[in-house]
Regions:
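Hydrophobic ligand-binding cavity/cleft-lining segments
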Residues: 1-43, 138, 153-155
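Short, surface-exposed coil-to-beta transition loops
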Residues: 2-4, 58-62, 83-88
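A short, structured loop/turn motif at beta-sheet edges
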Residues: 10-14, 41-42, 66-71, 90-99
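Short beta-strand segments that buttress and anchor functional surface loops
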Residues: 46-53, 74-80
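Short, cysteine-centered beta-strand-loop-beta hairpins and adjacent loop/turn segments enriched
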Residues: 53-59, 108-112
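Helix-adjacent hinge/juxtasegments
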Residues: 59-66, 74-77
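Beta-strand/loop substructures that line and gate deep hydrophobic ligand-binding cavities in soluble
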Residues: 77-131, 147
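Actinobacteria-biased recognition of intrinsically disordered, low-complexity terminal regions
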Residues: 145-155
Length: 155
């Protein structure tokens, strides 16, 4: 099952990549989710866990970074019982900033039952992801950035 959402962000691609790959800070903009990272820095092999919880029900989504290409792309492999597959975060330059895309290629559990279940929740999941990406864009756009010309002052 493939799912992908994109958002335009009025910030340099490097700033967008820095924000989306700050795993623990994803807890601030990914709806209903808290992310923890095992020590090791940003690199292939790094492990992290996202716990998503809504109305007291939740699941853990352990992941491993499988591709690390700053400031453009990072891939993770989902290793959990509920979520398995590949997530891809990409940042592309755009006029006035960058495009950020979050794609998931997931192997749904429980065969036909899992596919049917996801078909039911997909609209809500998509809405949650879109809102999360808009929140990310607002956060990144509101961060002070150095002025062009190297003055060190922020705008």
């Amino acid at each position: 099952m493939h799912l992908e959402e994109r958002v335009a962000i009025a910030a340099p691609p490097a700033a967008v990549f820095e924000a989306v790959s700050d795993w623990e800070a994803q807890s601030e903009w990914v709806a209903f989710t808290t992310v923890t990272v095992e020590p090791g820095g940003h690199r292939v092999g790094e492990r992290l866990t996202a716990v998503t919880r809504l109305a007291g029900v939740g699941f853990a989504d352990p992941m491993e970074v499988t591709r690390w290409e700053p400031p453009h792309r990072v891939d993770v492999r989902h290793l959990g019982r509920v979520v398995r597959g590949t997530g891809t975060l990409t940042v592309e330059p755009a006029p006035g900033g960058a495009w950020f895309a979050w794609a998931e290629d997931l192997d749904l559990p429980l065969g036909a039952v899992g596919r049917l279940g996801f078909a039911v929740i997909r609209p809500a999941f998509t809405l949650m992801l879109r809102r999360s990406l808009r929140k990310l864009a607002r956060q990144v756009e509101s961060r002070p950035r150095p002025r062009p010309g190297g003055t060190g002052r922020v705008r």
